[in-house]
Amino acid sequence: MNVGVAHSEVNPNTRVMNSRGMWLTYALGVGLLHIVLLSIPFFSVPVAWTLTNVIHNLGMYVFLHAVKGTPFETPDQGKARLLTHWEQLDYGVQFTSSRKFFTISPIILYFLASFYTKYDTTHFILNTASLLSVLIPKMPQLHGVRIFGINKY
């Protein structure tokens, strides 16, 4: 019997997206962002959808693909220090339910934004560029790859 020993993950970043209610909270946060943008009087519906998509994807890129390391003191001897949150997610195992959810969610938001903007060329280009900026880093072939040495250290 291990008395006084905490039963937790070596790196809490690996399982935080699998927590109870995390996906629901994520979806509610995106919905709340959209409602706030719709409540601004001078934003039309297409502008609100495009801004929802772009802000969501910008936040996803920053928090999952740009920020490296972990906010916790981990006993892994610095292994997580050089990994992005996406690379730490589910211990780097590809095609888990969390990774699928966070890959599908920007695609669904993209389809909604494209539909409600009536496929306007300007909105379509912005939404497509925003989508590609978060989908390309999620590809399994780019796990641990730093293009042009960006975000290497």
UniProtKB/Swiss-Prot annotation:
<dbReference type="InterPro" id="IPR007203">
    <property type="entry name" value="ORMDL"/>
</dbReference>
<dbReference type="GO" id="GO:0042552">
    <property type="term" value="P:myelination"/>
</dbReference>
<feature type="transmembrane region" description="Helical">
    <location>
        <begin position="47"/>
        <end position="64"/>
    </location>
</feature>
<keyword id="KW-1133">Transmembrane helix</keyword>
<dbReference type="GO" id="GO:0061744">
    <property type="term" value="P:motor behavior"/>
</dbReference>
<feature type="topological domain" description="Cytoplasmic">
    <location>
        <begin position="141"/>
        <end position="153"/>
    </location>
</feature>
<dbReference type="GO" id="GO:1900060">
    <property type="term" value="P:negative regulation of ceramide biosynthetic process"/>
</dbReference>
<comment type="similarity">
    <text>Belongs to the ORM family.</text>
</comment>
<feature type="transmembrane region" description="Helical">
    <location>
        <begin position="124"/>
        <end position="140"/>
    </location>
</feature>
<feature type="topological domain" description="Cytoplasmic">
    <location>
        <begin position="65"/>
        <end position="100"/>
    </location>
</feature>
<comment type="subunit">
    <text>Ceramide-sensitive subunit of the serine palmitoyltransferase (SPT) complex, which is also composed of SPTLC1, SPTLC2/3 and SPTSSA/B.</text>
</comment>
<protein>
    <recommendedName>
        <fullName>ORM1-like protein 1</fullName>
    </recommendedName>
</protein>
<dbReference type="GO" id="GO:0017059">
    <property type="term" value="C:serine palmitoyltransferase complex"/>
</dbReference>
<dbReference type="GO" id="GO:0006686">
    <property type="term" value="P:sphingomyelin biosynthetic process"/>
</dbReference>
<feature type="topological domain" description="Extracellular">
    <location>
        <begin position="122"/>
        <end position="123"/>
    </location>
</feature>
<dbReference type="Pfam" id="PF04061">
    <property type="entry name" value="ORMDL"/>
</dbReference>
<keyword id="KW-0472">Membrane</keyword>
<dbReference type="GO" id="GO:0090156">
    <property type="term" value="P:intracellular sphingolipid homeostasis"/>
</dbReference>
<dbReference type="GO" id="GO:0030148">
    <property type="term" value="P:sphingolipid biosynthetic process"/>
</dbReference>
<dbReference type="GO" id="GO:0006672">
    <property type="term" value="P:ceramide metabolic process"/>
</dbReference>
<dbReference type="GO" id="GO:0005789">
    <property type="term" value="C:endoplasmic reticulum membrane"/>
</dbReference>
<keyword id="KW-0812">Transmembrane</keyword>
<feature type="transmembrane region" description="Helical">
    <location>
        <begin position="27"/>
        <end position="46"/>
    </location>
</feature>
<feature type="transmembrane region" description="Helical">
    <location>
        <begin position="101"/>
        <end position="121"/>
    </location>
</feature>
<comment type="function">
    <text>Plays an essential role in the homeostatic regulation of sphingolipid de novo biosynthesis by modulating the activity of the serine palmitoyltransferase (SPT) in response to ceramide levels. When complexed to SPT, the binding of ceramides to its N-terminus stabilizes a conformation that block SPT substrate entry, hence preventing SPT catalytic activity. Through this mechanism, maintains ceramide levels at sufficient concentrations for the production of complex sphingolipids, but which prevents the accumulation of ceramides to levels that trigger apoptosis.</text>
</comment>
<feature type="topological domain" description="Cytoplasmic">
    <location>
        <begin position="1"/>
        <end position="26"/>
    </location>
</feature>
<keyword id="KW-0256">Endoplasmic reticulum</keyword>
